[in-house]
Amino acid sequence: AGDASSGFFRAVADGCPITHTSCSAPHRRLTKVSVIGAGNVGMAIAQTILTQNLADEIALVDALPDKLRGEALDLQHAAAFLPRVRIVSGTDAAVTKNSDLIVVTAGARQIPGETRLNLLQRNVALYRKIVPPVAEHSPDALLLVVSNPVDVLTYVAWKLSGFPASRVIGSGTNLDSSRFRFLVAEHLDVSAQDVQAYMVGEHGDSSVAIWSSISVGGMPALKSLRDSHRSFDEAALEGIRRAVVGGAYEVIGLKGYTSWAIGYSVASLATSLLRDQRRVHPVSVLAAGFHGISDGHEVFLSLPARLGRAGVLGVAEMDLTEAEAAQLRRSAKTLWENCQLLGL
């Protein structure tokens, strides 16, 4: 590369010769992100991380070599329009070596008529092939699980990786909370960026909407609306909750899969982690000991967590109603029972 560049560039006065190895740029640690699974979700995540300039190198891993090579080439061919990022790919975990962040999107698809337990067991078998090798190649990495059922598989990844719980995170209800904020913003006719609102607990149908967490411009939304006698009744609240829970199903029913929203959701998590932003996100973390969840129940579910370069830096103690806390504990109990069936 140095010899070729010397044909185009000339050193400044008193500068090193173009080909001199000591003239390289001052050392800066490069950031590497690996994405395991090159399906619709994995590629949306890779594309979003690429366009947001979050990594110097992106490694793609998938079991289908031709599709993988095609996806990598498709991104590489856009190099003139994107930040300078090295894109590598392979079917072997060795390509992920020295990653800072490993995003796992691979997962077994449910067969019609298959039980939830059988699907979980097939996913565990898949994770046994994926997680230990990537953990071995990048022992200091952060592990971000996106595959569903995300809470159980985050637990599986934690057990199989041997990483501390602070470095194993599930995407959890980060996207659910984005949908929540969007729908509240639509109802109030404000920007979603000015709305704070959290969905917590198990990702999916049993996620818990924390109504008291809703604020707009720093003002508690429900109290302000009640004080001004504006409408935000129980029916409206329940309608929003149902729309949040059904959001993914609606998208899948219309286009066959979800991709872009989860891509942006994961990129927001990657930004907080890799750039040490210490922002609070509702993500799947080890929840034992929080909100009455037994210390002996090693379950992962979503709680507002402060994220930085070291992973989970702390979990916010929310002021939940008894009904919200009870629902959270029920989800934890169900997740714990499912995890016990996996024999990890």
UniProtKB/Swiss-Prot annotation:
Q: What is its EC number?
A: 1.1.1.27
Give, as in the UniProt entry, the pathway in which the protein acts: Fermentation; pyruvate fermentation to lactate; (S)-lactate from pyruvate: step 1/1
Q: What does the record give as the reaction this protein catalyses?
A: (S)-lactate + NAD(+) = pyruvate + NADH + H(+)
Q: Which SUPFAM superfamilies does the entry link to? A: LDH C-terminal domain-like, NAD(P)-binding Rossmann-fold domains
Top EC group = oxidoreductase
User: Catalytic residues?
Assistant: H203
The molecular function GO annotations come to: L-lactate dehydrogenase activity
State the UniProt keywords alphabetically: NAD, Oxidoreductase, Stress response
Claim: Amino-acid biosynthesis is one of the keywords in the record: no
Does Nucleotide-binding appear among the keywords?
Answer: no
The positions annotated for binding NAD(+) are D62, A63, L64, P65, D66, K67, R109, N148
| Induction field | By hypoxia.
Give the InterPro entries listed for this entry: L-lactate/malate_DH (IPR001557), L-lactate_DH (IPR011304), L-lactate_DH_AS (IPR018177), Lactate/malate_DH_C (IPR022383), Lactate/malate_DH_N (IPR001236), Lactate_DH/Glyco_Ohase_4_C (IPR015955), NAD(P)-bd_dom_sf (IPR036291)
Gene Ontology process terms (BP): lactate metabolic process
Known partners and oligomeric status: Tetramer that arise from random association of LDH-A and LDH-B.
Q: Which PANTHER family match?
A: L-2-HYDROXYCARBOXYLATE DEHYDROGENASE (NAD(P)(+)), L-LACTATE DEHYDROGENASE
Q: Which family does it belong to?
A: Belongs to the LDH/MDH superfamily. LDH family.
Question: What protein is this chain from?
Answer: L-lactate dehydrogenase B
